Amino acid sequence: MAMLLYADSKFTSPYVMSVFVALTEKKLPFKIQTVDLDIGANNDPDYALISLTQRVPTLIDGNFALSESSAIVEYLDEAFPDPPMFPSDRQRRARARQVQAWLRSDFLPIRLERPTPTIFYQRPVSTPLSAAAQAASRKLCAGASELLGHGGDNLCGDWSIADVDLALMLNRLIVNGDQVPLALVRYAKAQWERPSVQGWVRRERLPL
Ligand SMILES: N[C@@H](CCC(=O)N[C@@H](CS)C(=O)NCC(=O)O)C(=O)O
């Protein structure tokens, strides 16, 4: 039976994107059910019965419902190991998970001032970054440059889902014309060309 992915109706959630990419990479059959976050449909009692967090993404696999994007991707990776979403080497895998957790728990000023509709609806903003967002941007670029200092195409050797998450965060800055080192721009661009990522980027979207 096809799995069901609950997604935001405008397809701008970076967390839904991460799960979409994992399902697509693994060529798993799945359907998408949209939830209109603009009207708070995620707080409807019916959705709360399905989604413990009342957020998207939530994945339904048979009678099992799971929220939190990184938990979903790890679940998929254990249930359907091929192709893997994380490096096989333990320390590289830990690094990929660290990056995922870091991107989800930090960089709030960037997320607020450079929201994902600026990427997926190609509507860059002209407001300069606040001092807090500039500091977050410096931290992000320093960390990403350090992680990619090996000169390879991916964060942790082989491609992993953390590359998608990092490219998304960098693109928040890049598409809005904020300063990002050229090596990171090239990295984000290459990651963005991945067919599974393009499958999300090119989705038909409702008007903003
Ligand atoms: N940590 C969660 C974050 C999920 C999240 O923040 N989803 C947003 C959309 S991007 C949402 O559902 N917002 C609605 C709300 O919180 O009311 C994950 O990784 O899945």
Give the positions of each predicted feature.
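Residue-level signal for well-ordered alpha-helical positions
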Residues: 79, 99, 176, 203-204
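Terminal-tail/helix-coil boundary detector
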Residues: 200-208
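GST-like domain detector, emphasizing the conserved glutathione-binding G-site
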Residues: 1-129
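GST-like fold's C-terminal all-alpha helical module
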Residues: 103-193
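Phosphate-coordinating loops and pocket residues in cytosolic domains that bind phosphorylated ligands
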Residues: 49, 193, 202
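A local structural micro-motif
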Residues: 31, 181, 199-200
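Conserved beta-strand edge residues that scaffold enzyme active sites
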Residues: 37-38, 187, 205-206
